[in-house]
Amino acid sequence: MATIPMPDGGTMEAFVALPEAGRGPGALVLMEIFGVGPYIRRACERLAELGYVAMAPDLYRRVEPGLELPHDEEGLGQAMQAAQRLDSQGAVEDATVALDALRSLPEVTDGAAAAVGFCLGGRLAYGLAVAADPDAIVCYYGSGIADALDQAGEIRCPALFHFGGGDQFIPRSDAERVRAVVAERPDWEIAIQEDGGHAFDNHEAPMFYRPEATARAWELTRDFLARAVPTGAR
């Protein structure tokens, strides 16, 4: 764990996973609506296994610090309420501070850092790329990205967007709008897993998890990050 001093005088806790080598580029993991729980911690560990220093900040610190909700129907309802209470601009500001903190860690080589966001975090990763300068972003089923495509020109880094073909919360038309913009950016990529819905990567949520879609998307994420923010490890 790491404690990040914040500009407002408070602090923000963050989970940190180190690669076997002890050093590597950074990967800022932006949480889903359930908070920094087992799934997000495991996402950090998966990235650490690829050679990244992974950090997941508690972006609910302005709502309820340390909020971690179960991946079941009751938890989903509570998580959606918590996400509605979250100020998106404030969360992007907190993510920007976390990105700087990650880059300043002695274990992070050359200050290089990507952002990888899931669900809520996918949208926040996009917002972070507008507001700051991550070296790359990976956005897993980020709702609201299609409505912020007018800001795409402000993003200067490579980007990979994942969507599920059967997403219950993001219309297919939104994914297609993102695809149209991606076609104009040679450093942007999009993948739609037709057999996946929303949160298909979430192994903690049986109602959403689709292992085949997860495996394909993770391979794309791995290869994208290897090109955009290489670690030297495979």
Where are these regions (language model features)?
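N-terminal cap/leader regions of alpha/beta-hydrolase-fold enzymes
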Residues: 1-234
